[in-house]
Amino acid sequence: MNRLDFVDQASLRDDIPAFSPGDTINVHVKVIEGVKERIQVFKGVVIRRQGGGIRETFTVRKESYGVGVERTFPVHSPNIDHIEMVIRGDVRRAKLYYLRELRGKKAKIKEKR
């Protein structure tokens, strides 16, 4: 292993639960406004997970007042307080970009049994 691998290994978080595309999760994000800091919850469906190691990211999509909102987070970011699993989804794809065009019941993902 070279020096960068040691730095990456030290920066990895071990409190992240195992989740995959199709899962519904709550991401508790630290938001800093001036001198105040608060926790904001972003609840949605994971539509992709990409990369590996310290550079790994995931994208969460939700509908807010009829408008689709997507947010991409680094998995090992210090700005993420914690991640909660809500529902395990049963999907057959690794990237769920097709959910962008679907609305209502068609955008619903089956729960894994």
UniProtKB/Swiss-Prot annotation:
It comes from the Bacteria. InterPro entries: Ribosomal_bL19, Ribosomal_bL19_CS, Ribosomal_bL19_sf, Translation_prot_SH3-like_sf. GO terms for biological process: translation. Keywords: Ribonucleoprotein, Ribosomal protein. One of its GO terms (molecular function) is structural constituent of ribosome. Belongs to the bacterial ribosomal protein bL19 family. This is Large ribosomal subunit protein bL19. It comes from Mycobacterium leprae (strain TN).
